[in-house]
Amino acid sequence: MKIIHIAMQAFTVVIFVYIAAVILSYSIMFVLAFWTLRKERSLDRRELDERFVDAFLSKPVSILVPAYNEETGVIATVHSLLNLDYPQTELLVIDDGSKDGTADVVISQFDMEKADKPADLQLATKAVKEIYRSRIHPNLWLIRKENGGKGDALNVGINFAKYSYFCTIDGDSILDEKSLLRVMKPIIMSDGKVIAAGGNVRIVNGMDVEYGAVSSVKLSGRPFVVMQIVEYLRAFLMGRIALSRYNLVLIISGAFSVFSKKPVIRAGGYNTTTIGEDMEMVVKLQRLLKEEKLGGRIEFVADPVCWTEAPQTMSVLRKQRRRWHQGLLESLWAHRKMAFNPKYGAVGMISVPYFWLIECLGPIIELAGYVYVIAAFFMGGIYYEYSVALMLLLVLYGTVFSMGAVLLESWSLGTFPKIRDVFRMMALTLTEVVWYRPLTLIWRVEGLIRSLFRISSWGDMERVGATGTKGAGK
C-alpha cells in the first residue's frame, strides 16, 4: 500500500504541473489571439481586397486538389474554385487512383478531353496515367495517376503546376469567394518573405450549399459535429494565431494553404511515407529556413475561410483523430533534432517542445488524469480532495477556453450570426469534459500506439455530400 500511496502522490504532482502548464500556455495564446484579432477587426476587409487585386496580377496561383474517392463532393469543390475572385489561376484536380467515379464525374460535368500538359518533373512520383482539360474552362485540368497517397498526389500537382505559388485544397472542401485573395495577402505584403500561409478551416455540415458556395450559415443539429466546430475554433483562432504572430507555426491545414513552390521543391516535396504530410511539410520548411538562414516566415491568416466536411459518426471521427495524432508524432519524430535546439531559434526552443509535450504526449498524461480522478475518488481521504481539485482543473481548461474561443470568434469574425447558435455551442462545451474529450483522448493515444507499431492507413471517410447541394449534410 505504501508503494501505491507514493505512486499516487508522485502522479498528483505530475498531473497538476502538466495541467498548470497547459492552462498557462492556453492563457498566453488566448491573449495574443485577442490582441491580433482586435487589431484586424478595425480594418475594412473590402477595401483591402480591392487594394490587393491589382497587386496579385503578378502572383498567379496553381490550385491543387488531390482527390481520392471524392465523387460526392468534388464537383462542389471545383465549382467553388472556379468562382474565386482572383485574377489568375489554374486548377489541377489530381485523381489519386480513386475506386469510385471521382474522375468520371469531373470529366462529364466539365466537358473534358484528353490533352498534354508541360511538366517540370523535379519530384519523384507514381506514374501519371492520363491528363484531361476542360473545354468549358481552359484553366481546369484533371490528372489521373496511380494511387500513392495524398503526398504523392500533391507532388504530381507541383510537377505540373506552371505558377510559382500553389494552393492545396482537399477534394471535399469549398472556399469563400475572397478566400484565396486574402490568404495570399501576407505573401504580397512581405514581398515574398512569407513562403507559406494557411487559412481558417470551418465545418460545412449543416450549411446550405449552392453551386459551390455556402448560401446559408446554420449550426448542425448533431452534438458530435458541434463539438468539432468548437475544437476547430480553439485550434485555429487561439493556437495558430498566437504562434503565427512570432513565426512559430508548425501546422497549417492541408485543407487550405498556399506555398511558394521553390522552397517546397528545395525541401524535397511532400513526404509520401507519413499520413501527416501537411504538418511534416511545414516543419520541414521551418527547418529549412533555419538551417539555410533564409529568413522567411510561415503565417496563419484568420479571415479567409475554407469549408470542409467533418465526420458525423463516432467510428469515422475515431479514424480521423487517431490518424491526425499519428501524423503529429511521425512529423515530430522525423525532425526530433529540432527539439530544444537553439540552432532553430524560437521554433526549436518553444514551438517544437510545445508540440511534443502538450500536443503529442499530453493525451497520455491527461487520460491518466481521468483514471486518477476515478481511483482517487474511491480511495477516499486526501485523495478524494485531490480528485475533486483535479476534476475542477480539467473542467476549467476544457470548458473555459472552449467558451473563450466561441466568444472570440463571435466577436471578431461572426461566422454564426444567430445568438442561439452561439449559446448552443457554449452550452455543449459544459459537457465536453465528461464525454467528448475523454473519447478524443483515447483515440489520440491509439494514434500514438499505431505510430509506434508503424500501422499506416488513412481509413475511408464516409461522405454525405455536405458540400453538394442545398441542404445536404444536415
Where are the predicted features?
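A short, conserved alpha-helix in the catalytic core of glycosyltransferases
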Residues: P263-R266, T274-E299
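N-terminal signal-anchor transmembrane helix
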Residues: M29-Q88
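Acidic donor-binding segment of Leloir-type glycosyltransferases
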Residues: H79-I143, I188
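Cell-envelope/extracellular polymer assembly enzymes that use nucleotide-activated donors
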Residues: K59-S62, E90, I265, E280
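N-terminal membrane-anchoring/stem segments of glycan-assembly enzymes
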Residues: M1-A55, R240, G369-Y372, G404-L408, ...
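Membrane-embedded multi-pass helical conduit in multi-pass membrane proteins
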Residues: Y354-L452
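Short aromatic/hydrophobic "clamp" motif used to bind/position activated sugar donors
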Residues: F166
